[in-house]
């Protein structure tokens, strides 16, 4: 049986727990101050049907959380490549896409920039809405947002490239 992500459940989770600054985050998970973005999208996908396993997991025990749960590049690598070892059908959980016309709610966006502040892939967010006026909107931790338009940050807001991680 293939792993299936319920996109609506992923968005419901994001809508419920997006505002980390007000303390509205799921207390069943650790919170990584100043660097919680990939932890947040991992929680969204876990709630929506992607099971935790020894290669993609989170823990309150220091050092026990996998990098694939919390680190931008490691999340992308796990979901689009090495997760195939953890699925019954041998396929990765997700695929990488580069075209914004091929995405929908529940997909993950990762931001890239080469600047003094960032050097490479540095931020993960989840698509929370496709708006008829603003287009792709996202929810995020670290810089908390619920329905922020992608157009606010890309291509003219400091983000120079985006990639999309989309469940199969």
Model regions and ranges:
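N-terminal capping segments
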Residues: 1-70
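Residue-level marker of positions within ordered structural domains that often coincide
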Residues: 19, 45-46, 114, 130, ...
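...with weaker cross-activation on analogous glycine-rich loops/strands in unrelated enzymes
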Residues: 61-138
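Glycine-rich, aromatic-bearing surface loops/beta-hairpins
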Residues: 123-168
């Amino acid at each position: 049986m293939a792993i299936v992500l319920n996109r609506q459940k992923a968005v419901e989770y994001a809508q419920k727990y997006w505002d980390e600054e007000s303390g509205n985050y799921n207390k069943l998970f650790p919170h990584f101050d100043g660097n919680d973005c990939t932890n947040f999208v991992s929680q969204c996908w876990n709630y929506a049907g992607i099971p935790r396993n020894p290669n993609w997991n989170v823990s309150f025990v220091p050092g026990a959380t996998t990098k694939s749960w919390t680190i931008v590049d490691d999340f992308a690598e796990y979901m689009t490549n090495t997760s195939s070892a953890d699925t019954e059908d041998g396929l990765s959980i997700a695929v990488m896409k580069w075209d914004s016309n091929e995405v929908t709610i529940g997909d993950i966006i990762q931001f890239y920039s080469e600047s003094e502040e960032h050097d490479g892939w540095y931020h993960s967010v989840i698509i929370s809405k496709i708006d008829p006026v603003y287009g792709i909107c996202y929810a995020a931790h670290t810089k908390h947002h619920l329905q922020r338009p992608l157009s606010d940050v890309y291509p003219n807001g400091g983000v120079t490239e985006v990639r999309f991680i989309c469940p199969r």
